[in-house]
Amino acid sequence: MAERELYIGVMSGTSLDGVDTALVALQDDNIELLAHHDYPIPADLKQRLLNVCIGQPTTLIAMGELEHDLGHLFSDAVLALLQHSGYRAEHIRAIGCHGQTVFHQPTGTKPFTMQIGDANIIATRTGITTVADFRRKDVALGGQGAPLVPAFHRTIFHAEQSTVVVLNIGGIANISVLKPNGEVVGYDTGPGNMLMDSWCQKERNQPYDKDALWAKQGSVNAALLSHLKQDHYFALPAPKSTGRELFNLPWLETQLATFSVDATDVQRTLCEFTAQTIVEQVAPFAEGPQPQLLVCGGGAQNPLLMERLQALLPSWQVAPTTQMGVDGDNMEAMAFAWLAQRRIHGLPSNLPAVTGASRLASLGVIYYPD
């Protein structure tokens, strides 16, 4: 049996709703969440990131400053977690930091993915070995560089007689399909909270539609819904991945240009858009007497979205991962702690059947504090 080690995972997703940190104990395939902490992203930094993510012109100086500021933000988040938990830096084997994705283009003649946040700053400010840059080796091997979390899902959730699909609804929605035969499939289904949040910010000056109270006041516009679903992404075969570089507010405004739809009805339609594009990808994987859809991420807190998922999948059990004893709000941060452990010990951490990479690989670059 391997020695029990402590790792910290740091995750900042496409929704830009904060930095999630998780302190976990890892031993073989056993994982225990010891502490977690959410750290806010300052409004100015969030806006600068949004501008870059939607393709607004920038400069090398601005990008360098973002890299620096995110390094400080992520290290501040780790230090806050340590203070909150009572653990010290010397207790921690390593940090796994995803970084902030600012662009993701894994296809074409020059594929690349870009996550920023200087890991040298994280390692030196915290005094803890840091693993970062998890995605680019998978892209170099011909993969999408995403999703990386299905390998972690396979470790903690098991499909025995029926399919288990783990659905993470962050800014983008992605699925990990765990089949009874042991096969794993995973990819991004399309928008999660991203368009709903962006529209709510634009029309209501609120970061998100809490409890879907605004969306519940509206009605689905069938013509708009059909139009949104025509985007080329949904016809692409797996493996595939996407992000804010495609599904963003300018994209939505372009789709709305030929429609005259009340803002409230737009919000309700966006919720239905997310639900239907998820279900159309999930439903074909049903196997066994009781397939399960286990939901994590911010979307699990949206009662209307959860209601629609269950209504559209009547033969499935739809439930948050918390009902399985795993806190869905910390799932991705826990996953990057696990990915850091895999890198520290030189173990493979991608699933070529999921990402499309040519082979297994141990992902991430190690940064030492000394």
Curated annotation (Swiss-Prot):
Pathway: Amino-sugar metabolism; 1,6-anhydro-N-acetylmuramate degradation; Cell wall biogenesis; peptidoglycan recycling. It catalyses: 1,6-anhydro-N-acetyl-beta-muramate + ATP + H2O = N-acetyl-D-muramate 6-phosphate + ADP + H(+). Pfam families: AnmK. It comes from the Bacteria. Keywords: ATP-binding, Carbohydrate metabolism, Kinase, Nucleotide-binding, Transferase. ATP binds at G13, T14, S15, L16, D17, G18, V19, D20. InterPro entries: Anhydro_N_Ac-Mur_kinase, ATPase_NBD. GO terms for molecular function: ATP binding; kinase activity; phosphotransferase activity, alcohol group as acceptor. Its EC number is 2.7.1.170. GO terms for biological process: 1,6-anhydro-N-acetyl-beta-muramic acid catabolic process; amino sugar metabolic process; peptidoglycan turnover. Catalyzes the specific phosphorylation of 1,6-anhydro-N-acetylmuramic acid (anhMurNAc) with the simultaneous cleavage of the 1,6-anhydro ring, generating MurNAc-6-P. Is required for the utilization of anhMurNAc either imported from the medium or derived from its own cell wall murein, and thus plays a role in cell wall recycling. Belongs to the anhydro-N-acetylmuramic acid kinase family. This is Anhydro-N-acetylmuramic acid kinase. It comes from Vibrio cholerae serotype O1 (strain ATCC 39315 / El Tor Inaba N16961).
